[in-house]
């Protein structure tokens, strides 16, 4: 080691060793590179072989056709040079198209997909349309190459090959146009979701079929995993686009609408999926100690562990995952302060809201609508308070939010209208096995209870060769399931009514008067739809209870009592709130009323209808709650109508203008008169006392108010001489009168007696005896001109003797004598 030769040899040895290692490393790297490329090369070779085989087959068939035509008709082959020129030209076109298309795809990928998540990039690379177009162009080039080889070896070609070549050339050009359009579409990253939407559509249809695959639990679980994976990719697409600028939110909305369409399709097919299918996910649910069993509590205490959660079927996992994507997109709209997109999304929800009611998803959908309301309310209210161009859009958003609850009730009514209890239960008695049950037509059979029932029936048939279970027991079991679903419907209707009313009430409390009036106007609509629901339910419930023969099987009581109570509470609170916001809004928009909704008219007409309805029901508390604020509303509405109709100065319109302008107070007098008559008939002075106290309070507020009463008396006196004919509200007023006439005639207190000449109402009331004592031939009272009762009994005491109101018939002379 001390010699120089040793170190020289060592130096060269290390150098040689380094060169050998470097060479080995280089060779290894190249081998690994070739190994990695080999997979691509294998794929290329496979594709090439397939293209060559298909092109050879096509060329062979065309050559055979050419040979047949030339032999059959003794034709000469085409000139080889012409075929070569056309083929080379076509190859050149295809090559240019392929190069341009690949460059276009590469530019789109680098601009839009270079930093996307892996799943999105893979979707772009696997786009069916793009790959199909490239495959057709490559196949055309291979086919042209084979044609050139045929020309080179001197094969005779004729029209069949030429026509095929021209057809394929045209197809390449058309393919490029489609591919170019697809490139434009793929520049929007939402468009790559189309293939996943198609896959999810197919999955939903497949899992709802009763075939070999969907009855197998392995395939049920497989479909769920495939759908969950596809939804996760949709979520990635939505999340990736959270940073797009506001002007591209419209594209995001289209993506959300596709999700809603998928959810709607799923709900229409969900009833076909068996309740125990592994398609439905399982969800852990924490237990409460006070609800746990003895054994569970003992194990937890002995081991020091908490009570183990229980797994339950998560039947809403699919729609829940889809709506989470939409919820994230809505939050993006709100972050951008884009209330117009929120409004459009609420419009898109209307169709699926009706579907939810129709396909037994109502309670779940109400919770979703409430969540949308909760997150969007701050932004909507901010635009309501700002007098900007988005204020009308915010009002429309409130309108559409309430419309969704109404659409839900419409869907529920459609479902209720299709329930034929007798036919449905009779059909259930014809089934002898669970697999025979048509759970799509009768979704009430899709439960654990019904499955056990039909398994037992099938066992009876297998063992005893005869069904032992009686028909009444089958009907009772199915009726029990329908009974439970009716209870859910009642809960949903109650929640929907309360939600709409709460929206209006909260907006009114926060001084958004126009928005509150908009929301409260929907309360009347939804109450009307709910009355239809109640009518259906109250027809169905007794029929179901008749099927409950075995009383040892307890049914949880279902009734509409709480629903009626909720409706009554809302009807009592609604008028006062609606009057406040409608009056406030009308005063603020008095001058530009033509550009605003007539909420004051809406309020007046609905309040009037509510008063008539309360008289019909003999509900003094409701009448009192509404009537105490009614006169102020009438005075404002009278002036509102008068200032609008006096614009018509034509002489021939004078009678019509007067009739319309004086209608509000005439109707107030009519309703007040009907209330007095009803109180007299029921022998309850509270009705008349209320009418008199409201009028007295008005007179005592200002001495000048007596002058207003004089003017009203003169106007009503003039209306008696009106020869207009049928006015625009005369039929409505007559209808109110007839409803009270009918209520009196149908009341148990209604009695008649005969005098020497006619049948008369039996009563101790002098007012009724003089005003409507005579009974008509059809056995009912006549309350025509009921406004006279109010004017004579209540108003005349505040009028001078020479201006007192007089009826047409003069019945007041006998009454006052």
Task: Name each model feature, range by range.
Residues 31, 72, 83, 98-99, ...:
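A generic structural signal for ordered alpha-helices
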Residues 33-49, 77-92, 116-136, 156-165, ...:
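Membrane-interface segments at loop-to-transmembrane junctions
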Residues 54-70, 79-153, 173-183:
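Transmembrane alpha-helix detector for multi-pass membrane proteins
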Residues 1-95:
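Membrane-anchoring hydrophobic segments
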Residues 5-17, 122-124, 149-816:
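Binding/recognition "hotspot" determinant
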Residues 29-47, 106-108, 113, 211-229:
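Terminal module of membrane-associated proteins
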């Amino acid at each position: 080691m001390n010699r120089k030769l040793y170190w020289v040899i060592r130096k060269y040895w290390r150098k040689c060793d380094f060169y050998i290692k470097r060479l080995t490393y280089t060779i290894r790297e190249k081998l690994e590179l070739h190994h990695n490329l080999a997979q691509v090369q294998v794929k290329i070779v496979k594709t090439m072989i397939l293209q060559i085989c298909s092109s050879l087959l096509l060329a062979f068939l065309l050559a055979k056709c050419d040979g047949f035509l030339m032999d059959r008709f003794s034709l000469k082959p085409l000139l080889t040079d012409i075929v070569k020129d056309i083929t080379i030209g076509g190859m050149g076109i295809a090559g240019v198209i392929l190069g341009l298309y690949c460059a276009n795809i590469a530019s789109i990928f680098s601009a839009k997909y270079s930093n996307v998540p892996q799943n999105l990039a893979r979707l772009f690379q696997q786009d069916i349309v793009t790959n199909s177009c490239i495959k057709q162009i490559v196949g055309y080039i291979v086919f042209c190459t084979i044609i050139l080889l045929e020309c080179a070896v001197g094969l005779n070609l004729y029209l069949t090959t030429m026509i095929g070549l021209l057809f394929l050339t045209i197809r390449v050009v058309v393919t490029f146009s489609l591919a170019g359009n697809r490139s434009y579409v793929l520049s929007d990253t939402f468009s790559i979701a189309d293939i996943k939407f198609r896959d999810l559509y197919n999955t939903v249809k497949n899992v709802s079929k009763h075939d070999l695959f969907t009855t197998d639990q392995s395939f049920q679980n497989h479909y769920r995993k495939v759908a969950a994976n596809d939804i996760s990719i949709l979520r990635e697409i939505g999340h990736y686009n959270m940073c797009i600028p506001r002007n591209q939110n419209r594209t995001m909305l289209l993506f959300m609408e596709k999700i809603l369409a998928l959810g709607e399709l799923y709900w229409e097919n969900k009833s076909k999926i068996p309740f125990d299918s592994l398609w439905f996910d399982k969800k852990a649910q924490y237990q409460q100690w006070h609800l746990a069993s003895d054994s569970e509590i003992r194990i937890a205490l002995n081991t020091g562990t908490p009570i183990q959660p229980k797994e339950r079927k998560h039947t809403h996992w699919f729609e829940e995952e889809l709506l989470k994507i939409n919820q994230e997109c809505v939050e993006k709209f709100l972050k951008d302060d884009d209330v117009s997109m929120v409004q459009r999304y609420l419009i898109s929800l209307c169709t699926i809201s009706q579907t939810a009611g129709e396909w037994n998803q109502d309670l779940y959908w109400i919770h979703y609508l409430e969540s949308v309301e909760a997150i969007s309310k701050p932004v909507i209210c901010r635009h309501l308070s700002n007098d900007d161009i988005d204020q009308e859009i915010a009002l429309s958003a409130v309108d559409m939010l309430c419309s969704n609850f109404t659409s839900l009730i419409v869907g529920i009514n459609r479902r209720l209208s299709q329930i034929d209890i007798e036919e449905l239960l009779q059909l259930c008695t014809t089934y002898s096995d669970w697999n025979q049950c048509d759970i799509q037509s009768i979704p009430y059979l899709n439960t654990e209870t019904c499955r056990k029932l039909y398994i037992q029936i099938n066992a009876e048939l297998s063992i005893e060769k005869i069904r032992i279970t009686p028909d009444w027991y089958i009907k009772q079991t199915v009726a029990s399931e329908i009974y439970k679903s009716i209870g859910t419907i009642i809960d949903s209707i109650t929640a929907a009514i309360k939600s709409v009313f709460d929206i209006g009430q909260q907006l009114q409390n926060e001084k958004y008067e126009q928005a509150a009036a908009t929301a409260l106007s929907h309360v009347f609509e939804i109450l009307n739809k709910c009355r239809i629901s109640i009518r259906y339910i109250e027809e169905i419930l007794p029929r179901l209870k008749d099927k409950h023969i075995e009383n040892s099987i307890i049914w949880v009581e279902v009734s509409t009592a709480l629903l009626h109570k909720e409706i009554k509470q809302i009807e009592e609170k609604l008028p006062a709130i609606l009057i406040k916001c409608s009056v406030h809004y009308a005063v603020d928009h008095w001058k530009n009323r033509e550009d605003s909704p007539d909420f004051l008219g809406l309020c007046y007409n609905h309040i009037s209808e509510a008063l008539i309805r309360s008289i019909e029901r003999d509900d003094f508390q409701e009448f009192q709650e509404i009537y105490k604020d009614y006169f102020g509303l009438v005075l404002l509405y009278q002036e509102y109508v008068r200032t609008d109709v006096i614009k018509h100065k034509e002489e021939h319109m004078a009678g019509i203008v007067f009739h319309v302008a004086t209608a509000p107070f005439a109707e107030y007098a009519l309703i007040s008169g009907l209330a007095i008559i009803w109180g007299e008939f029921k022998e309850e002075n509270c009705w008349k006392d209320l009418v008199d106290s409201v009028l007295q309070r008005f007179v005592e507020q200002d001495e000048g108010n007596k002058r207003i009463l004089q003017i009203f008396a003169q106007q009503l006196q003039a209306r008696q001489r009106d020869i207009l004919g049928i006015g625009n509200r005369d039929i409505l007023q007559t209808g109110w009168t007839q409803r009270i006439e009918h209520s009196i005639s149908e009341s148990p207190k209604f009695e008649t007696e005969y005098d020497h000449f006619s049948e008369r109402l039996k009563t101790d009331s002098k007012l009724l005896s003089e005003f409507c004592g005579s009974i008509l031939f059809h056995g009912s009272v006549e309350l025509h001109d009921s406004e006279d009762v109010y004017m004579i009994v209540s108003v005349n005491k505040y009028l001078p003797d020479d201006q007192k109101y007089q009826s047409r018939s003069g019945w007041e002379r006998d009454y006052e004598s």
